[in-house]
Amino acid sequence: MLCLGIESSCDETALALVEDGRLLHSVLSTQADMHALFGGVVPELASREHYRYIGPLFDELMRRSDKSNEEIDLVAVARGPGLLGSLLVGVAFAKGLAFSLGARFLGVNHLQAHLLAAGLEQPLKFPALGLLVSGGHTHLYRMETPWNCLPLGRTLDDAAGEAFDKVGKVLGLAYPGGRLMDALAGEGRADGIAFPRPYLDNDNLDFSFSGLKTAASTYVQQHFAGMTWPRPLGSTAAAPQELKDCCAAFNLAVVDTLCTKATRALDRNPQLKYLILAGGVACNSLLRQRVTELMERRGGQAIIPGPHLCTDNAAMIAYAGWLLGKEGYYHQLNMETVPRGRALPDDMRRCREYAEDLSET
């Protein structure tokens, strides 16, 4: 089965083709440089850029893949959560394409796709603990199957990735700040600054990073007054050691918090021997190291995709669509988009006859 995946939930316009679980080709247009001028994503500009590039990117993808449009069996698209205007561009394009080709149509949960992205590189193993850490979400899931994920904990205010970007902005780092903060942290010492580990004085599995963000911002205002470095800072070369140390301490506080909650979830679910790490913050080198060590100590395994599959991409949408499509799942063309802040409805339909036919081929 050939599945086209379309991703337009935020500021990346991306399309990919997955055939029988294998990535054939992917194309992407990023808006990072444009939004960096404003210090964050401007929703109206994001949706206009998606509209501008989605058609040409589809044409480019099909040329590279040496596939014809008529060979597409399933069109999968990120339906949410995300920015409403951005989602609408991708969903409208996907619906029109599926209708014109007579292909099946499927709306994919953007968060679920992140959790499944590692399957493009290595076998996914279940049941597993899913730790999704991105700019908009910090969630824990009990994953019984690729399409059966039980929420265990969620972000109550600022997500980890959002905290990285906002503190990076206070520090004068180029947007988005998370990647550069990771690099700066690698050259700093974390033991000189005692940032709090937020929301650990309870027995639940939810996250809250607003207090840590405020603590870091206050520290910068109190200790970095009068200090100068190039702004926006785009590399580690011109950064003073004090800045590197601050990034190291903040980075460690975030990672400690994530790993503490993950450990708590594993202790309560001892049958979970695998941990799937996903989302843009899964690119963080310290987080990848600590999660790997955590699972090794417990005799389990950490499943972590390559950094190129952690950030928003269409390969994960196409792969999630293929996994669901081969089980016979699909949506009707009146499916709605679901912006951030709303729960995705369980409205997929299933054609069991199609799934049985597919399993025999």
Curated annotation (Swiss-Prot):
GO terms for cellular component: cytoplasm. GO terms for molecular function: iron ion binding; N(6)-L-threonylcarbamoyladenine synthase activity. InterPro entries: ATPase_NBD, Gcp-like_dom, KAE1/TsaD, TsaD. It comes from the Bacteria. It is found in: Cytoplasm. Fe cation binds at residues 110, 114, 312. Pfam families: TsaD. Its cofactor is Fe(2+). Substrate binds at residues 132-136, 165, 178, 182, 284. Keywords: Acyltransferase, Cytoplasm, Iron, Metal-binding, Transferase, tRNA processing. GO terms for biological process: tRNA threonylcarbamoyladenosine modification. PANTHER family: TRNA N6-ADENOSINE THREONYLCARBAMOYLTRANSFERASE (PTHR11735), TRNA N6-ADENOSINE THREONYLCARBAMOYLTRANSFERASE, MITOCHONDRIAL (PTHR11735:SF6). NCBIfam families: gcp_kae1, T6A_TsaD_YgjD. Belongs to the KAE1 / TsaD family. This is tRNA N6-adenosine threonylcarbamoyltransferase. It comes from Desulfovibrio desulfuricans (strain ATCC 27774 / DSM 6949 / MB).
